[in-house]
C-alpha cells in the first residue's frame, strides 16, 4: 500500500542574519597542512573539537567530487511557506527529535555508505525515513532505500561519484522509492549493496575496501522472498522549494523532521573525533551530504546535531556537531528536505 508522502523540498541559501558570525580567516600556512602536521596544529590551535589521526585516502573515498556544489541543479518553482515565516519566539535554545520521537528508530540509525560517494542519496533516504515516522506519529517505521536512489536516479548525479540531494527528493516525487536497509539485511525491498569497509567491533567483517566502489546497477525488483512487488513498495511525495534562513531551517525541523545539508569538506574534518566541528586548517578535499536532526548550545557555542553515514563507531556514535550560525564550510547554504502533509 502506498504511503503518500507530500514533500516540501528546500534549497536553502543562507544570508547573514543576527545569529551569524563572520567566517574565520584561515592562515595560508594552515590551509596547506596535511597528515600528522595538521593533526598537531589542530591539537594546539583550537579547543572546539577533539581529533585523531585518520588515513586521508580512505577518507576521500566517502566524499563527493567538488563539481556537485553546483547550485543550479534545483527545482524551477519556488514556493514560500508562510507558516514558517511567523515570529521566531518559539524556537528553543536546543531541540533533539530523538527525545520527542524516541519511538522512531530511524532517528537513531546510522548507515554506512562504505567506499562510495553516495552520501547525497543515503542522507536523503534517511531524512525521508524519519519524516514518514514523525508524520505518522511513530506508526509507520520504514527505512527508505538509498540504494534505489543511488542506482536508479541517473539524472540525480553519477552514483558513487556524487549527486544532488535536491534531485534525490525530486526523484522521490517523480518515481517513488522503495524500502531498504543496511548491507546484507533482510525485510526490505532493496537494501544497500556495498559492504562496510574494515573492522567494526564485533560486527561481521566483510573485507577491506580499495579505491572508490563501482555504482551498483539499477534493479527494479525487490529481494527474492520479500512479500511486496517493487511497484507496490514505493513511497511517493510532492516536491517544491522554500525560501531559507537559519530560523526557517529550525522551524522546518521542528515541524516536519530532519533536513539534508551539503557542504565543502576540508582535511581537518577527516580527523574529527568529538566536539563541535568548525573548519580550522587543512586542504579542501571534496563535498559531503549529511542529515541535520536538531541543534543545541554548549558553553555559549551554538551547533547543529548531525547524523553522518560513516558507521556508528565514527565520531559521537555516528553523529557529530557542526558550528551553527557561521555558515561554516557553506553548511547552511544548500539544504533539502521533505515535509509530510
UniProtKB/Swiss-Prot annotation:
Q: Which EC numbers does the record give? A: 3.4.22.-
Name of this chain's protein? Cathepsin B-like cysteine proteinase 1
Maturation-removed propeptide residues: 20-88
Role of this protein: Expression of the protease correlates with blood-feeding and suggests a role for the protease in blood digestion.
Keywords, comma-separated and alphabetical: Disulfide bond, Glycoprotein, Hydrolase, Protease, Signal, Thiol protease, Zymogen
Q: Does the keyword Disulfide bond apply?
A: yes
Top-level EC class as recorded in UniProt = hydrolase
Signal peptide (from-to): 1-19
Any single biological process term in GO: proteolysis
Q: Which Pfam families match?
A: Peptidase_C1
Q: Which family does it belong to?
A: Belongs to the peptidase C1 family.
Q: Which residues form the active site?
A: 119, 288, 308
* Glycan attachment sites: 103, 202
Q: Name the InterPro entries for this protein.
A: Papain-like_cys_pep_sf, Pept_asp_AS, Pept_cys_AS, Pept_his_AS, Peptidase_C1A, Peptidase_C1A_C
Q: From the record, give the cysteines joined by S-S bonds.
A: 104-133, 116-160, 152-218, 153-156, 189-222, 197-209
Q: Which domain of life is it from?
A: Eukaryota
Q: Which organism is it from?
A: Ostertagia ostertagi
The record's section on SUPFAM superfamilies has: Cysteine proteinases
Give the GO molecular function terms.
cysteine-type peptidase activity
Amino acid at each position: 500500500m502506498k504511503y503518500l508522502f507530500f514533500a516540501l523540498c528546500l534549497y536553502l541559501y543562507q544570508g547573514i542574519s543576527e545569529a551569524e558570525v563572520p567566517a574565520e580567516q584561515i592562515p595560508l600556512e594552515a590551509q596547506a597542512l596535511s597528515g600528522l602536521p595538521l593533526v598537531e596544529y589542530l591539537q594546539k590551535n583550537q579547543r572546539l573539537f577533539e581529533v585523531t589521526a585518520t588515513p586521508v585516502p580512505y577518507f576521500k573515498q566517502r566524499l563527493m567530487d567538488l563539481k556537485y556544489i553546483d547550485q543550479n541543479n534545483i527545482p524551477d518553482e519556488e514556493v514560500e511557506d508562510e507558516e514558517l515565516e511567523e515570529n521566531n519566539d518559539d524556537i528553543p535554545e536546543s531541540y533533539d527529535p530523538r527525545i520527542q520521537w524516541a519511538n522512531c528508530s530511524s532517528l537513531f540509525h546510522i548507515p554506512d555508505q562504505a567506499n562510495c560517494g553516495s552520501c547525497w542519496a543515503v542522507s536523503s533516504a534517511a531524512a525521508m525515513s524519519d519524516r514518514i515516522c514523525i508524520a505518522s506519529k511513530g506508526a509507520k517505521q520504514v527505512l527508505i532505500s538509498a540504494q534505489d536512489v543511488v542506482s536508479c536516479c541517473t539524472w540525480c548525479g553519477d552514483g558513487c561519484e556524487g549527486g544532488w540531494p535536491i534531485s534525490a527528493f525530486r526523484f522521490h516525487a517523480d518515481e517513488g522509492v522503495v524500502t531498504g536497509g543496511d548491507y546484507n539485511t533482510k525485510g526490505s525491498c532493496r537494501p544497500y549493496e556495498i559492504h562496510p569497509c574494515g573492522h567494526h567491533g564485533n560486527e561481521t567483517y566483510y573485507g577491506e575496501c580499495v579505491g572508490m566502489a563501482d555504482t551498483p546497477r539499477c534493479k527494479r525488483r525487490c529481494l527474492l522472498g520479500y512479500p511486496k512487488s517493487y511497484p507496490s513498495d514505493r513511497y511517493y511525495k510532492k516536491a517544491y522549494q522554500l525560501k531559507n534562513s537559519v530560523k526557517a531551517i529550525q522551524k522546518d525541523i521542528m515541524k516536519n523532521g530532519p533536513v539534508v545539508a551539503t557542504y565543502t569538506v576540508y582535511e581537518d574534518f577527516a580527523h574529527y573525533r568529538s566536539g563541535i566541528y568548525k573548519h580550522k586548517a587543512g586542504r579542501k578535499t571534496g563535498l559531503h551530504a549529511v542529515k541535520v536532526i536538531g541543534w543545541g548550545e554548549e558553553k555559549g557555542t551554538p551547533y547543529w546535531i548531525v547524523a553522518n553515514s560513516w558507521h556508528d563507531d565514527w565520531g559521537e556514535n555516528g553523529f557529530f556537531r557542526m558550528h551553527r550560525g557561521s555558515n561554516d564550510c557553506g553548511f547552511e547554504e544548500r539544504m533539502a528536505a521533505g515535509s509530510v502533509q
